[in-house]
């Protein structure tokens, strides 16, 4: 009942002025009442943003597809790396002018210190981390404030990461004030202790990703990992947004299949083959058997004659449950970060076990034995490959970790690529809206990063190993 009331409140917020405007109108939306309670603004920012980052387009059709968690079984253009420019424009503009605009409004108005301010800083860092990981250089220091600039400069990823790490450290130190987050907290239901752990864990994610680029990041990461109680320490503390058990405000992947009538994706052959080779107990959760009773993944970029019956559909827990959660960060990921940063085999095995437990299965001795032997032979490859498996359902993070490390190495250019020889796309294409609104700064960023005329291939991201 509490969840239903929260989502009814969200509908009220959306219809009372949560509409999106052009990039240069952030913080000046005349349809957004200035006296809306901050908890309502937080609710809108979290709901709109997470539904976008974990929705069918950004999560499945692009990031999750290019990370080869999923494969297209019809309308497979994106599996050939042909993209729709309006999709990337919608995601880029939608994150800036919706959730980030709302969060900046909270930051401008919330008492300092306060739990509300800390939550807004945390979610702002979360969204910006995804934006820069997908697009590289983006507006950051001059963004979200038209008083500073209506044509904000594009900042280097090193600048953005440093700012996000600072904000997350500030947020973690601030949680524990007396103010109530109210009904707007769709992540932890007002538990600021868990919010603090999420802020610290997200900081660990960013520090780990860039530790080889900045010695101070590596030092800060080791200090953070030395205090595991300050991080997500169990599956009960996972950062996730759940949905009411109805078809109206449902899990966006469920909504895409049942409300929109789309069934364009299956699990990838890359995923199924890797899980089968190690007898992974999560396979029945991630995938459905085909009509012949077998687990068969769809080869990325390939047209199958009878894909709806011959290959495995996405597991029911992810696609067929209207109340299924969108997961932002997990205990398993924290353990994999520790395993990589500290060369800790036990943390790696614990991460595998935590991911299995998250999905209601047991990591048996035989499975852990296979995984342990793989670690002994190739530690980093094993850690990232299992991290990629644990990230199923979080396409953006899986895509980022593959681009950072090159693992799993089973992910390769599809045979029918529209850009043969270029490999897997290195980035999302910049939005067409910026060509008209911020052309000079956009073109300078494109030149600095070596973005070619496809828009999706460039120099490696700053954090590439």
Tell where the protein language model's regions lie, with residue ranges.
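Short coil/turn segments at secondary-structure boundaries
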Residues: 57-62, 286-289, 395-404
């Amino acid at each position: 009942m509490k969840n239903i009331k929260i989502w009814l409140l969200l509908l009220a917020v959306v219809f009372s002025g949560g509409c999106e405007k052009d990039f240069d109108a952030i913080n000046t939306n005349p349809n957004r009442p200035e006296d809306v309670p901050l908890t309502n603004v937080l609710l809108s920012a979290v709901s709109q943003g997470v539904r976008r980052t974990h929705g069918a387009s950004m999560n499945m059709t692009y990031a999750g597809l290019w990370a080869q968690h999923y494969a297209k079984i019809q309308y497979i253009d994106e599996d050939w790396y042909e993209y729709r420019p309006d999709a990337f424009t919608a995601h880029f503009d939608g994150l800036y002018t919706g959730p980030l605009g709302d969060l900046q409004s909270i930051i401008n108005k919330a008492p300092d210190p306060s739990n509300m301010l800390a939550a807004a800083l945390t979610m702002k860092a979360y969204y910006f981390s995804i934006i820069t990981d997908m697009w590289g250089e983006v507006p950051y220091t001059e963004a979200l404030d038209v008083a500073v600039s209506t044509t904000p400069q594009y900042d280097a990823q090193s600048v953005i990461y440093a700012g996000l790490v600072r904000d997350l450290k500030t947020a973690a130190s601030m949680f524990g004030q007396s103010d109530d987050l109210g009904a707007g907290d769709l992540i932890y239901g007002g538990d600021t202790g868990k919010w603090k752990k999420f802020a610290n864990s997200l900081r660990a994610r960013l520090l780990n990703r860039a530790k080889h680029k900045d010695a101070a990041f590596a030092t800060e990461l080791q200090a953070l990992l030395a205090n595991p109680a300050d991080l997500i320490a169990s599956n009960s503390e996972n950062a996730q947004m759940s949905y009411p058990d109805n078809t109206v405000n449902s899990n966006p992947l469920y909504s895409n299949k049942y409300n929109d009538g789309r069934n364009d994706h299956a699990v990838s052959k890359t995923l199924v083959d890797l899980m089968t080779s190690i007898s992974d107990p999560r396979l029945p959760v991630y995938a459905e058997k085909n009509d012949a009773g077998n687990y068969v993944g769809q080869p990325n970029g390939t047209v199958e004659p009878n894909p709806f019956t011959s290959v495995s559909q996405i597991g029911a827990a992810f696609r067929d449950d209207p109340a299924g959660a969108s997961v932002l960060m997990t205990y398993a990921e924290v353990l994999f970060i520790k395993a990589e940063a500290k060369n800790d085999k036990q943390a790696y095995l614990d991460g595998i076990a935590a991911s299995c437990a998250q999905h209601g299965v047991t990591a048996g001795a035989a499975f852990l034995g296979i995984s342990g032997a793989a670690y002994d032979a190739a530690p980093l490859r094993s850690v990232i490959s299992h991290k990629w498996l644990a990230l199923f359902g979080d396409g953006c993070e899986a895509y980022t970790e593959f681009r950072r490390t090159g693992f799993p190495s089973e992910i390769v250019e599809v045979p029918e690529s529209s850009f043969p020889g270029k490999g897997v796309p290195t980035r999302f294409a910049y939005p067409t809206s910026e060509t008209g609104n911020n052309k000079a700064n956009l073109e300078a960023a494109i030149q600095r990063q070596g973005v070619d005329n496809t828009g999706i291939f460039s120099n490696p991201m700053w954090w590439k190993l």
